Amino acid sequence: MAVKIRLARFGAKKRPFYRIVVADSRAPRDGRFIERIGQYDPMLSKDNKNCVVVKADRLKYWLNVGAQASERVLWFIKKGIITLEAEKKKVETKKAEIKKVKEQEV
């Protein structure tokens, strides 16, 4: 089973919207998929940060286990529109949160 990372078309006529999905290469373009990892809206301006939204950690996982990216997904990666670096989430500990509240009270 060859697995591909590709675009699946959704949206209305002349108003396309794409989902970035991981699917079996034999499945239809808009058919069954394994996992939805992002979306692409070509109707938004190119500098809009929501034009392409991808779960970077899942994309990296699927590429590491051997999934092949389609030409358009590879183009997004090469242009830097999709970054494979996972964004670090800010996690505040309970102690840091309590300390911050105490500082604001004083």
Swiss-Prot record:
Domain of life: Bacteria
Keyword NADP on entry: no
PROSITE patterns given in the database record: RIBOSOMAL_S16
MF annotations from Gene Ontology: structural constituent of ribosome
UniProt entry tagged with the keyword ATP-binding: no
Alphabetical GO biological process terms: translation
GO cellular component: cytoplasm; small ribosomal subunit
Keywords: Ribonucleoprotein, Ribosomal protein
Family statement: Belongs to the bacterial ribosomal protein bS16 family.
HAMAP family: Ribosomal_bS16
Matching NCBIfam families: S16
Protein name: Small ribosomal subunit protein bS16
Organism per entry: Wolbachia sp. subsp. Brugia malayi (strain TRS)
Encoding gene, per UniProt annotation: rpsP
